[in-house]
Amino acid sequence: MADSKKRYLGIDIGSTTFKAVLLSEDGKVERTVYKRTQPVEAGKVACTGHCSGCGACGGGASKRLALEFLKVAGITSFKDIAAIVVTGSQIVEDTRKFIPFDFQVSEVTAHVAGAKFLHPDVDAIIDCGGQDSKCMVYNPTMKLWTSMMSGVCAAGTGSFLDSVAAKLGVKIEDVAEKVNYDSDTEFSSVCAVLSATSINKFKNRVPIGDLLAGACKAQARTILNSVGQLLLNAPGRKILFQGGVAFNSAVAFFLKKLTGSEIVIPQYHEVMGALGAAVIARQLHDLRDSGKLDLAKVEYEPTRGKSVTLRIKATRRDFFSSDKSKPLVWRNL
């Protein structure tokens, strides 16, 4: 390292983006990165059910992105980081072969930690990413955070707006400035497919600003329909809106209009999960240094629930290689 100061790394690997935050010894954000990930090229991955560590998959790509991120900060190795904590939907047990993390935390834990780091008094959070939406609300009576995650529909996620922007030929970063905020155009907020069908039907008859307004309103309604019920008992409270979708201020505008609450888009909103992971990494290092926690005695072994194991056994299909000696890949169908 260029100096003896300790740094803490938080990494959040989601379905569409790679996020990382480097935190200094005194708790300041030194660097951040928010980068869209790319699908693995066909034919490059040849694993046979077990990770070979070749690095051709998403795990290898994440390692390369993380090392590039650290290199800009003058750090050449993961060994120069005091503690690494990871989170995100794409973190799997084989991720450790590529990124030697010390601890893994849930997305909810990471997002709350990041939000409280910047806004200590926060008690309501909406996070909207590429794959799902989450709502987290603090219950002062029970002194704990309650959370809710959206279902499988893409309508309340960043992927929906990506597809709408592509369909209309608009760059996703230009959507907010092209929205007609006075438009009364409405689209279905029940299903992403129905919304896309409606947009396709009207795109040659309705101004693009109205179409984008309808899409952003549909997105805001879907977020609230899927996870917003946690906010029903506390109308008018300040809500932190974070995640990649918060780049689109139009969605925040319609969330405010629908809820009547103050919607705050915090600094580092796009990397809040990674920021929370970095904050936890700093806390983890302090506990380890003080002797209150010995990670060497904690066995890291992700386990799946019994019901999930039974379902996988019941639905697995083996696709055999040409010599029939072992599966080429395993699929859950």
Identify the residue ranges that each predicted region occupies.
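Gly/Thr-rich phosphate-binding beta-strand-loop-beta motif of the actin/hexokinase/Hsp70
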Residues: 2-26, 122-141, 333
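Short glycine-rich, Thr/Ser-proximal phosphate-binding strand/loop in the N-terminal lobe
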Residues: 8-60, 144-147, 151
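Short beta-strand-loop/turn "lid" adjacent to the catalytic site in phosphate-handling enzymes
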Residues: 37, 50-56, 73-108, 145-146
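Glycine-rich phosphate-binding loops at beta-strand->alpha-helix junctions
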Residues: 88-91, 218, 231-258, 269-273
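Conserved phosphate-binding/catalytic loops in two-lobed NTP-binding clefts
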Residues: 101-108, 256-275
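A short helix-loop
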Residues: 137-142, 150-151, 158-193, 288-305
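Adenine-nucleotide phosphate-binding core of ATP-dependent small-molecule kinases
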Residues: 195-229
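Acidic, glycine/GT-rich loop-and beta-edge segments that sit at the periphery of enzyme/chaperone cores
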Residues: 283-333
